[in-house]
Curated annotation (Swiss-Prot), chain A:
The keyword Transmembrane helix does not apply. InterPro entries: Mdm10. This is Mitochondrial distribution and morphology protein 10. It is a multi-pass membrane protein. GO terms for cellular component: ERMES complex; SAM complex. Belongs to the MDM10 family. Pfam families: MDM10 (PF12519).
Swiss-Prot record, chain B:
Its main location: mitochondrion. PROSITE patterns: SMP. Residues 338-375 are annotated as: Disordered. Component of the ERMES/MDM complex, which serves as a molecular tether to connect the endoplasmic reticulum (ER) and mitochondria. Components of this complex are involved in the control of mitochondrial shape and protein biogenesis, and function in nonvesicular lipid trafficking between the ER and mitochondria. MDM34 is required for the interaction of the ER-resident membrane protein MMM1 and the outer mitochondrial membrane-resident beta-barrel protein MDM10. Residues 348-359 have a biased composition (Basic residues). The keyword Lyase does not apply. The gene is MDM34. This is Mitochondrial distribution and morphology protein 34. GO terms for biological process: mitochondrial genome maintenance; mitochondrion organization; mitochondrion-endoplasmic reticulum membrane tethering; phospholipid homeostasis; phospholipid transport. It comes from Saccharomyces cerevisiae (strain ATCC 204508 / S288c). Ubiquitinated by a SCF (SKP1-CUL1-F-box protein) E3 ubiquitin-protein ligase complex containing the F-box protein MDM30. Ubiquitination is important for mitochondrial integrity. It is a multi-pass membrane protein. Lacks alpha-helical transmembrane segments, suggesting that it resides in the membrane via beta-sheet conformations similar to those predicted for other outer membrane proteins and porin. The SMP-LTD domain is a barrel-like domain that can bind various types of glycerophospholipids in its interior and mediate their transfer between two adjacent bilayers.
Length: 493, 459
């Protein structure tokens, strides 16, 4: 589950129109959330509330060996923050947890302005207007967290300096370990490029990250006129000035929808030239209730490899489905709004700027009465001539839209997450769900110890034969043991 | 007092095995904070001490203070040893940094996996020579390393790191000998003194090993029973030393050697020692040079006390061309080093006189006249008032190979050096001759002996 403060942060980004999908840090976010999800390691309780429209509090308890916890405050002067924040009873499960990240292809706004003008929906226009608004109001977020009894402090300041830039300052101060770390981020997002300059006081780490979105031009090979894919290339460079330790990596990401089923899939390929790591991932949303991910790691220098699998299974609310649909406005007022707005906005966004918005054009033609008859006839002829391809576009778009609608409208009650890695011989298991207004996540990490015990028994073979049989039976009984186990409750109002 | 040095311990390979065992347990001890960069334990692959370490006792003093037992100066030397250790290190330093800092402030890096490299370090042909002060007291043994000369060849499997590791190792060696080793020896010796005779170890694998230690420790402290085990030869020597001291005779007990005990100097042999201090005539005498009967330097002069002997070379030595100029220069610089004990960096000021031949036609007339001219020319160049060169004429020697050597302002008695050079060749080439001397030496400078870079040749 996402911690409450992360939900607030996400809402802040949404309200200030800062897109997170452009960050190089999140270029492999989909595979990361499907494979390396966090498992609670203790009994954990989080109670949070929105005290005023601009302030948020959260209280954490966790019991591992003794009770410790944290208290966090957040203040933001962003407007309409309450529109994006929901309490734990109302929030849809797919928003409360990290899951498959659906990307929206980036449009070059200056080019697409002519097309979007004719669009019947105003969300994109609003976004665009806000981004290019001369009356941009600087928004900021202040966050502080205090841990007890260790009395460590965490602080974060985010400031939107201009429509395209953002400044972030994170700091940790630990009294016991006399550890003080400050990290500054300066981010500049021009929709095609996102550049980040990072400086951290730990090891005097300097970093530069860049992500470039290639415009999705219709290719010659592409039989699909309706272009919905996006191709991004990113790189990062790091240098720790104290230890003179360098680091760099580069990543290519391709995101598209399957034309037949309309289901999204993501491919990434990242390479670390310094240490020779190559890792490729393939993640696909195979249905409304399942997601799969495979990751293959390979090292060029040491020829070590690793194969990881991850999957998610979502469970819908089967019974009361009809009543839910009827009472949709009552139960899920904001999600209903999302259902209304998002598909249309997605549709216009998915639509490539080179292809005219035919849907709206067709709609507009009868309404425009000032068009002469011969021109009207010409338009009709054109429409008829290209009707097959237009129909194809509509079909493709409709399948994608249909799939998106399906996911957004369905109410999930719980999700099972599994991930395993061949080299590490671990199996992670996590259940997340909603129960009476609580967001619950419970999970365990199992470690296979068969190889380890076999080597042990090999050693003991020299001693006597009795111990072998004893260890063999033990092996048969318990080949795995849990390395981690925990449960987490979240409640927010 | 006697010692028994058990060579059998070093004789077979078990000694190397024991060192390997101890080293690997010490390097992998859980009490030590494990470095993040190390991804596995340190494995000691090979230890090889082919020769028995030599222990030379230079001085021994049994003090009658209540707790201390003995105090001594030892020379420890060890040759051609070899050591090879192996471990696995993490080469991705950013990953280590990422693990150290809290995740809240650490930006997330993509594809920043761990990359481990196995590394093998080989120290070959280790040569150690150290002079140590040893204090044996009741709770333990204290050792201070005074003059450590350690040399080894270092070879690392990762060539990029080799120079860095070698430099750091050499820097840290200072600390090892100054701090680590003495404290280590003291702690282990404390065990010997306190746990004597009882095997209190709980680990069954080490019991035998521990037992060995305790049996060894018995020989450290003298018991009454130990006297029975002393060797008769040593007792005889000891008694002779004692008797020589009790007679108060100024003559040494043994006529042909400097000291009864090798490496020890007795008061009555001091003049011999001094007489063999490296001065020009002593150096000469230390060589087995057949002294001619007609020598101007009598053998009596050799045993003269230092203050009346002069630092000069006998004429016969020069005549027989036993020494070349380089040897004399070496002796002189050694003399200078000894007398100049305060600062090591002072270089001897040498007076160089270039004897360039500026021949006038009259000089070419006769050999004898030329020689006189040359020597007087030198005298005018080195116009120090104390120096009184007395040139002596020699008919046989070629003209510009006759020269004077001035070593000390006070003691200078110039001698001729006849160098064994081809005179014809030199006359044809007109090669300039360099005159090398050493001056402004104060005779009252304190001399030091023992434990210097070049100990006096009294063996």
């Amino acid at each position: 589950m996402l911690p409450y403060m992360d939900q607030v942060l996400r809402a802040f980004y949404q309200s200030t129109h800062w897109s997170t999908q452009n960050s190089y840090e999140d270029i492999t976010a989909t595979s990361r959330t499907l494979l390396d999800f966090r498992i609670p390691s203790a009994i954990h309780l989080q109670i949070s509330n929105k005290s005023t429209p601009n302030t948020f509090n959260s209280l954490d308890f966790s019991t591992r060996s003794r009770i410790n916890g944290s208290l966090s405050y957040l203040y933001s002067d962003a407007q309409q923050l309450e529109k994006f924040m929901r309490n734990s009873t109302d929030i849809p499960l797919q928003d409360a947890t990290e899951t498959y990240r659906q990307l929206q292809p980036n449009l070059n706004y200056s080019v697409s302005s002519g097309n979007t003008l004719s669009s019947d929906n105003t969300t994109v226009d609003n976004d665009k207007k806000l981004l290019h608004d001369s009356k941009f109001v600087k928004k900021s977020l202040y966050y502080g967290r205090m841990y007890y009894p260790s009395s460590d402090l965490e602080a974060m300041i985010i400031k939107r300096l201009s429509p395209q830039t953002q400044f972030m300052l994170k700091g940790v101060s630990s009294f016991k370990e006399s550890l003080n770390v400050l990290t500054c981020y300066f981010q500049r997002d021009s929709h095609r490029n996102l550049q980040e300059w990072i400086f951290s006081t730990s090891d005097l780490l300097c970093g530069y990250r860049v992500l470039h979105n290639f415009l999705t031009t219709p290719s010659k090979f592409n039989t699909s006129l309706y272009n919905n894919s996006s191709l991004s290339l990113g790189a990062e460079f790091w240098l720790g000035l104290v230890s003179l330790s360098p680091g760099c990596s580069t990543t290519l990401r391709y995101y598209t929808h399957s034309t037949n089923t309309g289901r999204p899939l993501t491919l990434t390929l990242s390479w670390n030239p310094l240490f020779g790591h190559i890792s490729s991932t393939y993640s696909a949303k195979t249905g409304t209730n399942s997601t799969f991910c495979a990751k293959y790691d390979f090292n060029l220098y040491s020829i070590e490899s690793n194969l990881s699998f991850g999957c998610e299974f979502w469970q819908k609310k089967h019974h009361l489905l009809e009543t839910n649909k009827n009472n949709n406005d009552k139960l899920e007022p904001i999600s209903d709004e999302l259902v209304d707005i998002n598909p249309n906005s997605r549709a216009t966004k998915l639509l490539h700027e080179n292809v005219p918005d035919l849907n709206s054009a067709v709609n507009d033609i009868p309404s425009t009465l000032d068009i002469p008859v011969h021109k009207q006839k010409l338009l009709n002829d054109l429409t008829y001539a290209f009707s097959s391809s237009l129909r194809k576009i509509d079909e493709e778009r409709s399948t994608i839209e249909k799939f998106d609608n399906k996911i957004n409208s369905s109410i999930f009650t719980s999700v099972w997450k599994l991930s395993t890695s061949l080299r590490d011989k671990t199996l992670k298991l996590l259940w997340e769900g909603k129960w009476r207004g609580f967001l619950i996540s419970a999970g365990t990490e199992l470690v296979f110890t068969r190889g380890f015990q076999e080597s042990l028994s090999d050693d003991e073979k020299n001693d006597n034969a009795i111990s072998i049989s004893a260890t063999d039976t033990e092996n048969g009984n318990i080949p795995v043991f849990p390395a981690k186990f925990g449960i987490q409750f979240q409640y927010s109002t | 007092m006697s010692f028994r040095f058990n060579e059998a311990v070093f004789g077979d390979n078990s000694f190397n095995e024991r060192i390997r065992e101890k080293l690997s347990t010490a390097l992998n001890s859980p009490s030590k904070k494990k470095l993040d960069i190390l991804k596995s334990g340190i494995k000691v692959q090979k230890v090889d001490f082919p020769t028995i370490p030599q222990l030379e006792i230079l001085d021994l003093d049994i003090i009658t203070q209540p707790k201390s037992l003995a105090k001594g100066i030892c020379k420890i030397s060890c040759k051609d040893a070899m050591l090879r250790i192996q471990t696995v290190i993490e080469s991705n330093l950013l990953l280590i940094n990422e693990q150290d800092t809290p995740s809240f402030t650490m930006p997330q890096l993509i594809n920043n996996g761990s990359f481990t490299i196995p590394i093998t370090m080989t120290f070959s042909s280790i040569e150690l020579e150290a002079i140590t002060n040893i204090f044996v007291k009741n709770p333990g043994i204290g050792i201070s390393f005074n003059d450590v000369d350690l040399d080894f060849k270092f070879d690392c499997s990762v060539k990029i790191l080799q120079s860095t590791i070698e430099r750091r190792l050499k820097e840290s060696m200072h600390v090892v000998f100054k701090d680590v080793l003495p404290s280590l020896i003291f702690n282990t010796s404390q065990n010997w003194f306190t746990n004597r005779g009882e095997s209190t170890s709980t680990i069954p694998g080490k019991r035998e090993h521990h037992h060995q230690q305790t049996t060894m420790s018995r020989n450290v402290i003298l018991d009454g029973s130990d006297f029975q085990e002393l060797s008769p030869i040593n007792m005889l020597r000891l008694s002779s030393i004692v008797s020589s001291r009790s007679t108060l005779s100024l003559h040494s007990t043994v006529m042909n050697s400097l000291s009864a005990i090798p490496g020890c100097l007795e008061r009555q042999n001091l003049y011999r020692f001094i007489s063999r201090m490296p001065s020009l005539n002593n150096y000469y005498s230390s060589q087995s040079f057949p002294q001619p009967k007609s020598s101007t330097v009598s053998s009596k002069q050799l045993v003269k006390p230092f203050y009346c002997s002069h630092n000069l070379l006998p004429k016969t030595v020069l005549d027989s061309s036993q020494y070349d100029l380089a040897t004399i220069t070496k002796i002189q610089s050694r003399l200078f080093d000894r007398s100049n004990s305060n600062d090591d960096n002072a270089k001897p000021r040498r007076r160089k006189i270039k004897c360039k031949k500026t021949r006038t036609p009259s000089n070419l007339q006769s050999q004898g006249e030329q020689a006189v001219d040359d020597s007087t020319a030198i005298e005018t160049v080195t116009s120090t008032p104390v120096q009184t060169p007395i040139p002596e004429l020699e008919e046989q020697s070629p003209p510009y190979l006759k020269t004077t050597v001035s070593i000390r302002d006070k003691y200078v008695i110039p001698e001729k050096i006849s160098l064994n050079l081809d005179s014809k060749k030199d006359t044809s080439k007109k090669k300039p001759f360099y005159f090398i001397g050493l001056n402004s030496q104060e005779p009252s400078n304190n001399w030091k002996w023992g434990m210097e870079d070049s100990p006096p040749p009294y063996h």
